[in-house]
Each structure stands twice: as structure tokens, then as C-alpha cells.
């Protein structure tokens, strides 16, 4: 089994991986930007190294900086989490070429499935059909018009290397094609660095159902359970649950087998998710996410399988600890994404800021996967996911009631969150009846009366400023930088840390010289 794992990520997923490593007796290495120097994942890790910078491009998406930390820390494995480099073929290859284990699928599988056009071709070649669409990149809007005339309107232009609804435009008539084509390409280029797009038929009332798979290097590949992620807004998932409501057992079996077929066709191992659209008793291949999903905890709750631990086992060369036949599912689980957004009147405006109070709910069947604690700050420069509330019940009705209770119990102050909108979703009869689709939140759910959770903080946390300080350690002089409250900037700061990494302090604070990144 791997001895030391670097987590090339931040927020709740970095915390999730660190905790799994701790339970397995594996040392952990965190990396952080200037804004994240006091972040929870930094405080929890055994070692932490500064990447510098403010934006993701300057830090978490800087390949050379991360490769340098891998070498300096002696990590023998890298977990990419989700987002950032998790589905980047070049990053995975750069890791493996250095003799370090990438905790994910092989680069070749990422390459095939990372491009939505090539993934459609691969799935179709394996006998798993997707929504009718093009298998080549679009050159201009005339091809969109031709496809719409052949298959009917509306159609959807999608970024080939995108996700989360970015780089996607729905075209309802020939007149909208040119503007939508240019807009989709522009957004794709800004969001993913590639502007290639394709077009496909746009289903009118589909459900988004995905299948969790995992394989090892010994030829084993299984499907665990499906997740229904139909409660979405602007193609961003809000609520996920497992098992999917009103989902026929024979369709579940067929979808699971199809997911494994797709995975085997591209030589896949480790954890992955095959996404489908389901409408009128038929399911269509959508894409494969070659990474751990945000919503993986609902599968863990109903299966009892620790997917992160299993990822590490597989990456270490061990076989899966279970077989397809040994998987037993129990009860129902629901995950709520708690984002720093103000849902007032259904607008979902970003709400970065200082969290003055964060007290997650507790109780039987209640789990909180968070990336922040009281006193932490949600930055405008990164994804605003504060954490995920996951509740389990013996059946769906119990799970819904438990989730509602937990949401009402949740205390978070200083920022606005999506909790009021989450309550509106779970209390709506359409959701209770399980008849919602991916269009339901935007087309049916009325959030105009939803209020804000913003609170007036008793006092904002004082800004910290950088100061260069000379310190002496064991008779050797070092120049280090420290971050201190502005009011104390003129004071003499004693203490420091030598070397590139320091043991983070669990209690927060700036950690003296800063965890990692010292010039010694």
C-alpha cells in the first residue's frame, strides 16, 4: 500500500481524502495557495507546502509547482480529487512518468473518456448508445442547423471538453444557431482552454441517472449503485440520491451492465462514473467521469463501501475487496450540496466571505463532508461548495424527513447558503413523488419566495498581511515570511520553521512561517 499521498486539491474533497488516508495509516501531503494557507485541509494534513498565487491557475493548476512538491515531499502517490487536474491526461502522465502512482484511471482511459465526442464513439463501439448526436467537432453554425433539421428542434451544443453545463447552449430554432454556436465556443475556451463543440438531440424531460463503477488492475470491474442527480439548476447538481426513485429493477441491471461494458472498453480501472439520461423507459449514454464524483458519499452510505479507501487499494495494486455478487445495498441516501450562494428569489448570487459560525447537524444517519469550519473564509476565486450534507434512512421517506430535520438544524452564519432552496426542493410534492427531471428546478419549481440566510456578523476577521522575518533555528539563520493580523504588523514576530514543510496546526492560525514554501 502507498506510504505517502499528496492531495492535489483543496476544500472538502481534500479533507475527505486526508481522513481516508489517516484511517489507513498513510501519511498525507497538502498543497495550498496564498488564500488557503489556513484552510482546513492544510490543518489536517501531516505536511503542507505552499504553491503561492491566488487564482487556481497560479496554484492548484500549476503542474510544475505540484511536481516540485511531489519531489520535495517524497510522496509516492497523488490523489487528484475532483476538478482541477482530476481528468487531465497530461498531468496523469507527468505523475506516472516520475514513478509516482496516480490514484485514478490510466492516462489512456482519461484521454478516451475526457473528450465527450471520443467517449460517445467508444461507448457506441461497445454497444452502448448515446443521445443521437455528431461524432465530429462542429466547424460552424450551418452544421447545427443541418442537424436540427434532420433530428428536430431543440438541439444542444456542448463543449467537448466541458462539464457542469458550461459551454452548453440549447438551440430551439434555426435563427438561434449562430449566436449559440459562438457563445458555446467562447465559454468553452474560457472555462476549459478548448473550444471544440458538438451537437446532440435535446431531450425534453429527462432524468439524470449515473452509475458508480470501480475496477482494479486484476481484471475485476463492478457497478455498485445508481445515483439520481436530476435536481439541477443550470446543469449544476443540487441534490443527489441513491437509489433512484421509480426506477425499474430491470433498467437498473441493464444500466449497471452497460456502465461496466463502457469501462472495460477503454481499459478502465479505479473509480469512475458513467452518466446516462433516462426518459420514456430508455437510457442513453451521456459521458463518463474518470474521477471520484462530488456525490460519491450517497453510494457509500447505501453500500457500506469506502470508495476513497478502495481507490487507494486499487492504485496500490491490490484487488477489489468485494465482488459484484457480494455488494448489498441498504436503505436510501440523499446528498445536499451546501454552497455559498444567496438563493433569495431564486437568483443564487455568489456569497463569498468569512464564516463566523458553522455547526453542522448531527444524529443517526447524518454525515457532513465539509471543507470549512467556523472562522474560515470562502474565497471568490474558487468553487463555493462549503460542504455536503448526506443523510441515510431505511427508506426514501425516512431519508427525506431526516434530511429536512438536518437542514433546519444546520447553523452557518456570516455567509448566505443554498439551504432555503434545498428545503424548498425536498418539501415539494414533485420531489417527494420522484417525478422531477433535469428541467424541473428551472421550469417548475417556484423559488421566488425563497429568502436569504445572510446574517450580520458580530465582527469581520481581521485581514492578515505578509511580513518577512529572520529567524534562527539550531544556529542557522533563515529568512521566512509570516502572515499576521494587520494590527500586529508592526510587532516583532518570534518563531519560525525551517525547510520546505511544517507540521500544520490543527487549531488554525497562520502557523508561524506558514506550512511549507519556506525559503530554507
Regions found by a protein language model. Give the residues of each.
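Catalytic cores of soluble metabolic enzymes centered on carboxylation/carboxyl-transfer
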Residues: 259, 297-504, 510
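N-terminal beta-alpha lobe that positions the nucleotide/phosphoryl donor
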Residues: 1-274, 278-295
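Structured functional modules or segments
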Residues: 508-520
Amino acid at each position: 500500500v502507498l506510504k505517502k499521498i499528496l492531495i492535489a486539491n483543496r476544500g472538502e474533497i481534500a479533507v475527505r481524502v486526508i481522513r481516508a488516508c489517516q484511517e489507513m495509516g498513510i501519511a498525507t501531503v497538502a498543497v495550498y495557495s496564498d488564500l488557503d494557507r489556513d484552510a482546513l485541509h492544510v490543518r489536517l494534513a501531516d505536511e503542507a507546502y505552499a504553491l503561492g498565487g491566488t487564482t487556481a491557475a497560479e496554484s492548484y493548476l500549476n503542474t510544475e509547482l505540484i511536481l516540485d512538491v511531489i519531489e520535495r515531499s517524497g510522496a509516492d502517490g497523488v490523489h487528484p480529487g475532483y476538478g482541477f487536474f482530476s481528468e487531465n491526461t497530461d498531468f496523469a502522465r507527468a505523475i506516472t512518468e516520475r514513478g509516482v502512482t496516480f490514484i485514478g484511471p490510466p492516462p489512456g482511459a482519461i484521454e478516451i473518456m475526457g473528450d465527450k465526442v471520443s467517449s460517445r464513439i467508444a461507448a457506441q463501439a461497445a454497444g452502448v448508445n448515446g443521445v443521437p448526436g455528431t461524432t465530429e467537432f462542429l466547424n460552424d453554425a450551418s452544421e447545427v442547423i443541418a442537424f436540427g433539421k434532420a433530428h428536430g428542434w431543440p438541439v444542444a451544443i456542448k463543449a467537448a471538453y466541458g462539464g457542469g453545463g458550461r459551454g452548453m447552449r440549447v438551440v430551439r430554432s434555426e435563427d438561434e444557431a449562430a449566436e449559440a454556436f459562438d457563445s458555446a465556443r467562447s465559454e468553452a475556451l474560457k472555462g476549459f482552454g478548448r473550444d471544440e463543440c458538438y451537437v446532440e438531440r435535446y431531450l425534453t424531460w429527462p432524468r439524470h441517472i449515473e452509475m458508480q463503477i470501480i475496477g482494479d488492475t486484476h481484471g475485476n470491474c463492478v457497478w455498485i449503485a445508481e445515483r439520481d442527480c436530476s435536481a439541477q439548476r443550470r446543469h449544476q447538481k443540487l441534490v443527489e440520491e441513491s437509489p433512484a426513485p421509480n426506477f425499474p429493477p430491470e433498467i437498473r441491471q441493464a444500466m449497471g451492465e452497460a456502465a461496466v461494458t463502457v469501462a472495460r472498453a477503454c481499459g478502465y480501472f479505479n473509480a469512475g462514473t458513467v452518466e446516462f439520461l433516462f426518459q420514456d423507459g430508455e437510457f442513453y449514454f451521456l459521458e463518463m467521469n474518470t474521477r471520484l464524483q462530488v456525490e460519491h458519499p450517497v453510494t457509500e452510505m447505501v453500500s457500506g463501501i469506502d470508495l476513497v479507501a478502495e481507490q487507494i487499494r486499487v492504485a496500490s495494486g491490490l484487488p477489489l475487496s468485494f465482488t459484484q455478487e457480494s455488494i448489498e445495498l441498504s436503505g436510501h441516501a440523499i446528498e445536499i450540496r451546501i454552497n455559498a450562494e444567496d438563493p433569495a428569489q431564486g437568483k443564487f448570487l455568489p456569497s463569498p466571505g468569512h464564516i463566523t459560525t458553522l455547526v453542522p447537524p448531527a444524529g443517526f444517519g447524518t454525515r457532513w463532508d465539509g471543507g470549512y469550519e467556523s472562522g474560515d473564509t470562502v474565497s471568490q476565486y474558487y468553487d463555493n461548495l462549503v460542504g455536503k450534507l448526506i443523510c441515510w434512512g431505511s427508506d426514501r421517506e425516512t431519508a427525506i424527513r431526516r434530511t429536512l430535520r438536518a437542514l433546519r438544524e444546520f447553523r452557518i452564519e456570516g455567509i448566505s447558503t443554498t439551504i432555503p432552496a434545498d428545503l424548498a426542493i425536498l418539501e415539494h410534492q414533485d420531489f417527494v413523488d420522484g417525478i422531477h427531471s433535469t428541467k424541473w428546478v428551472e421550469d417548475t419549481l417556484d423559488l421566488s419566495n425563497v429568502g436569504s440566510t445572510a446574517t450580520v456578523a458580530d465582527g469581520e476577521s481581521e485581514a492578515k498581511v505578509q511580513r518577512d522575518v529572520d529567524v534562527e533555528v539550531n544556529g542557522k539563520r533563515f529568512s521566512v515570511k509570516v502572515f499576521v493580523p494587520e494590527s500586529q504588523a508592526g510587532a516583532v514576530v518570534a518563531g519560525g520553521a525551517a525547510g520546505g514543510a511544517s507540521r500544520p496546526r490543527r487549531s488554525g492560525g497562520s502557523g508561524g512561517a506558514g506550512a511549507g514554501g519556506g525559503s530554507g
